[in-house]
Structures are given as C-alpha cells and as structure tokens.
Amino acid sequence: VLAVVETAWLFTRGTQSVRIIRAATMDGEFHLHVHGPAAARQSHVFHDVIDCMRYQADLERRLVGQGFALERFTGDRRRTPRRS
C-alpha cells in the first residue's frame, strides 16, 4: 500500500517519546501508526478519515493526561512510489 500523504506528531515526556504517523493511501484507507513509548508499536487502519481523527484525538488526550507534551509536528509529507 502506497502512502500518498503522511503527517507526524512527536510527543515527549522526559526521555520517553511517542510518534504518531497518519498516512492516507491511494485506495482511500487511513493508517495510524503509533511508535512508542520504548519499543511499543501499534498500527490501525480506518476507512473513514473522521474515525481516524477521532481515534487520534482520543490517543493524544490520553498521552497529555499521562504527562506527554507535543514536541513536534510535521505536516503533509508527500511520498512518491519508488521505482524498481
């Protein structure tokens, strides 16, 4: 699955970090990848951008409630398919 647009958020708390990456694909799916804290990894697939954004907002509220703060935002990183 090729990602068309990626947006990333980095949350930190002390030496811990959580990176959230939202990717839209050419087939209309929305992927939410959560890396951290530590070696934890999760991936979620949504067929509706609103559902994806709601899940992400809830996740961000939980992170802030646990003492994480938004460190960095990277928006609209367009990817092009690699040629073989």
Where are these regions (language model features)?
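N-terminal helix initiation/capping motif
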Residues: 78-79, 83-84
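Short glycine-rich, low-complexity/disordered patches
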Residues: 65-77
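A short, charged, amphipathic alpha-helix used as a generic interaction element across diverse proteins
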Residues: 47-65
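The feature represents the first ordered module of a protein
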Residues: 1-18
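Short aromatic-glycine-(Arg/Gly/Cys) micro-motifs in beta-strand/loop hairpins
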Residues: 15-42, 61
